[in-house]
Amino acid sequence: MAIITDVRVRQPLKDDLVGRRFTVTGIGSGFEGTIGIRLLDRRGDVLAQTSAQSAGGMAAVGEFSTEVRVTSPPPAGTRVTLQVFGDNPGLPDEGPDPGFNLREVSVIMFPDLQGWLLYRVERGDTLTGIVRKTRPFGRTTVKQIVAANPRITDPDRIETGWRLRIPLRD
C-alpha cells in the first residue's frame, strides 16, 4: 500500500494582507495529526511559531485551522513568509527541517491591520489623492498602499481600472 502525506494552505494566500493575529487554514497530515506553522522575517528569523491538529489524525489528510499571534511584529508593509508543514516524528537531526511537505506562502504584514478598502483607480487619480479620499475610513500612507499592492512597481504610475487594497490601521 502506497499511502502518502500532504499539506496544503487555503488561507492566507500569496500576497494576502495579515495583521499581528491571523488565521491559517488548510488540509494536511503530520505525525499524530500535528501541523507545524512558523512565520519568518526576511532574514529567516522566527517571528511566531505554533501548531494545529489535522482532523485526519495519524495518516489521513484532514482539515486544520489555527490562529497565529505575532508578539513583536515587523513594520507595516513588511513581506514575511508563512511556513506550514507536517510535523517531523524523528529526532532533531532526522528527516527534513522544519518538517514534511513544507509549504511557504509570502504574505504582507500590517501589525495594526483593521481591514482594507478595495479602491478602483479612476482617471486622474494619484496615490496621494487616494490617501486623501479614503482618510474618512482610516489611516494609511502612500508607502503602505504601495506595500499592500505588489503590482505597483512605480508609485507615480497607476492605471485606470486597477483595484487597489487600501490598508486601514487601528
Residue ranges with predicted function:
Residues D45, W162-R163:
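Residue-level signal for well-ordered, solvent-exposed loop/turn and beta-edge residues enriched
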Residues R10-L13, E122, R132, V146, ...:
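Residue-level detector of conserved, well-ordered beta-strand and adjacent loop positions
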Residues A2-D112, D154-R157:
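Ser/Thr-rich low-complexity repeats and stalk/linker segments
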Residues L13-D16, N149-P150, D170:
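Short, well-ordered turn and helix-capping elements at secondary-structure junctions
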Residues V142-N149:
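Short, structured beta-strand/loop micro-motifs enriched in basic residues and often containing a Trp
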Residues P136, R151-T153:
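Short solvent-exposed coil/turn linkers within tandem alpha-helical repeat scaffolds
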Residues F110-F137, E159-W162, R169-D170:
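Primarily a LysM-type cell-wall glycan-binding module
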